[in-house]
Amino acid sequence: MLNVGDSVQIAGCSTKKRLLETSSGCDSFDTLIGGALVNSSIVLIDEYRSRCYGSYLIRSFLAEGLHHGHRCFIADPTEDPKEINLIPSRRTSTDMQNQEIPNSLPAENENSMKIAWRYGNVKQVSSSLGPLSNENQYDFTKHVENPNVDVYAEKVFTLKGIYETLCQIVKENEAHTKSGGRGGPKKNLLRVVLKNIDMEICEDYKFLGRFLCCLRSLARSSYMIVYITANSFRVPKPTWRILESAADTHIQLMPFDENEKKMFKHLGTAHGYFHLKSLPRLMSVGTHTPPILDLIFEASSRKGFQIRVMHLPPAFDEPAPGHQNTPSCQNIDF
C-alpha cells in the first residue's frame, strides 16, 4: 500500500484503493481476480499432475513486463527456463484487423437450421471472461527476439542464492525499493518467476519455509510481483501448507483425465479445471468476489491461456416438461 504523500508512476501500473496494480498479461485472469495484480503479491500456481499449462501464464506475465519495460527475473532448478525463448509478442492493430470476421458471409442453405422465433431476441450465452473480443492481447505464434530477462544461472541452485540475488536486484539503484515522499530515483516494477519450487534439488530445501517468509517480507517492501509454480500432487501436506500460507493468490490447474475428456466433448478444446483456491489477500477488506467459480481453462500455442465458464450439456435423457412418462389409467391392472 502507498504511504501518505507517495507519488509513484510506473509504466504499465495504475493505482486503485491506494494500491499499485498491474496486468498479468492474461485478460481472463485479470478479470477473475478483480482487474489486475496488486503490487507485492505472491501468486501460487498449482500445476496438479502436470507441468506444462502454467507455462502459458508465466509467458503472458513476462510478456506484459517486457512490453512496459519492467525488469524480469526467472529461476528454475530443473533446467534452463524454456519460457525465455517462447515469450509471445504483443498484437498490433494490423494483426487484430486481419483476424476480424469478413463482411461477406456465405449464403444460408435452404435446409439449414434456424433458431426458433421465441428465442430470436435472447442473448447468446458467453463462456469467456474478460473483453468481449475473446482474443488474447499477445500472439503466442510470434516470439520476442532476445528478451531482456535475468536468469538465475548459478552452478549450485540454492534458495539462499536466489534470495541474495533478488536483494541485489531490488537494491540496485534503488529502482524497486519503496521510499516515502517525492523525488529520488525512478522506480520500476520487478516481475519474479520461481518455477518448480517444490523440487527437492536445492541443497537447502529444508529451509523452504524460511525462504518464503523472507521472500514475502522482501516483496512487501518492494515494487515486486512473484509467480511460484509447484505440483501439489507430489508434495507432502506440511510442505504444501507452507506454500499456501506464503501465497496471496492461489490457483490450481487440474487437467482432465481420459474419462472426463470423453464426457466433456461439448467443451471443445478445454484442457482442464481452473480452481481459484484463494482470493488476493492484499485487498481482503474490499476484495473482488467472482460471480462464478465453475471454470475451465484452455492453453494452446495459438490462443494462449484462456479461462472460460463451464457450462454443462442439457440432459437429453430427461423428458420435457408436460411429457412425463407416467402410466395411464387404462394400462393399470387390478
Curated annotation (Swiss-Prot):
Molecular functions (GO terms): phosphorylase kinase regulator activity
Pathway: tRNA modification; 5-methoxycarbonylmethyl-2-thiouridine-tRNA biosynthesis
Keyword list, A-Z: Cytoplasm, Nucleus, tRNA processing
Name under which the protein is recorded: Elongator complex protein 4
UniProt cross-references to InterPro entries, sorted A to Z: Elongator_complex_protein_4, P-loop_NTPase
Pfam family, one: PAXNEB
Family affiliation: Belongs to the ELP4 family.
Annotated localization: Cytoplasm; Nucleus
Oligomeric form and interacting partners: Component of the elongator complex.
Role played: Component of the elongator complex which is required for multiple tRNA modifications, including mcm5U (5-methoxycarbonylmethyl uridine), mcm5s2U (5-methoxycarbonylmethyl-2-thiouridine), and ncm5U (5-carbamoylmethyl uridine). The elongator complex catalyzes the formation of carboxymethyluridine in the wobble base at position 34 in tRNAs.
CDD domains referenced in this protein's UniProt entry, alphabetically: Elp4
